[in-house]
A protein has these predicted regions:
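Conserved hydrolase catalytic core segment
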Residues: 3-57
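Generic detector of intrinsically disordered, low-complexity, polar/charged segments
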Residues: 10-14, 58, 68, 83, ...
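The feature captures the conserved acid-bearing segment of alpha/beta-hydrolase catalytic domains
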Residues: 49-80, 150-152
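Membrane-interacting alpha-helical segments
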Residues: 41-65, 161, 167-174
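A sequence-composition feature that detects small, non-aromatic residues
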Residues: 11, 18-19, 23, 33, ...
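C-terminal subdomain of alpha/beta-hydrolase-fold enzymes, centered on the catalytic histidine
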Residues: 76-213
Length: 213
């Protein structure tokens, strides 16, 4: 960012972008604050005897993900190249691999096009198909999972929680890692692809936090 002329800046991210944003917040003193829409933290074991309703739902979501929704992650983190050959060879296979996540992770009431337009869905698929990056994008999991750093983050942080997000965390769970959590909001609609699903709401969340810094 300094090479672009920004001596101070804010950063925002979700999914892998949340990991990158967190890294910026911990490794670059010029990053003054971070906002996340998928902050990954472990449940605080000290809260297990007095869980809130939200925390109970979050734990149920973790369990569902591990049992039914994490097959893609296990494949990409162990045998990404094997998967890549099939996806690079089949546009239908590539589309199915991507679009299933829009079905599962958007606030779509059973149909992805209720949350994201068909053109946007196909554009997302084409990013992988035209660039032939099914394998290399999958390898990100294989290359990164062993390097995950769950250490303390002292940078001022804001977190927005969407109901159809993959991982959700309560405010007190987040504060165990993000020790300067200044903004926490649980929204009524939206999912994992918040910027595509609810762009106005997404922008408002980012502005609401950074405006306070």
């Amino acid at each position: 960012m300094q090479s672009l002329g920004y001596e101070k800046y804010f950063a925002q991210g979700g999914d892998w972008g949340a990991a990158v944003t967190t890294a910026l917040g911990t490794q670059d003193s010029n990053c003054e604050a971070i906002h996340l829409n998928m902050a990954v933290v472990s449940p605080d074991m000290e809260t297990m005897d007095n869980l809130t309703e939200f925390e109970q739902q979050a734990l149920a979501g973790f369990q569902f993900y591990q049992e039914w929704d994490s097959g893609y992650s296990k494949q990409q983190s162990t045998r990404p190249q094997t998967l890549g050959y099939g996806l690079t060879d089949s546009p239908i296979g590539q589309a199915a691999w991507i679009l299933e996540k829009f079905y599962q992770w958007t606030d779509c009431d059973g149909h992805p096009e209720n949350a994201v337009s068909r053109d946007e869905l196909l554009t997302n698929v084409m990013f992988y198909w035209l660039t032939e990056t099914a394998a290399s994008s999958a390898r990100l999991y294989w290359e990164s999972f062993g390097e995950f750093n769950g250490g303390e983050v002292k940078t001022p942080t804001g977190v927005s929680i969407y109901p159809k997000e993959i991982f959700k965390a309560s405010e007190r769970w987040l504060k165990k890692r993000y020790t300067d959590l200044r903004y926490y909001n649980v929204l009524d609609s939206g999912g994992h692809f918040a910027a595509l699903e609810k762009p106005d709401l997404y922008v408002n969340e980012i502005r609401s936090f950074f405006r306070s810094i």
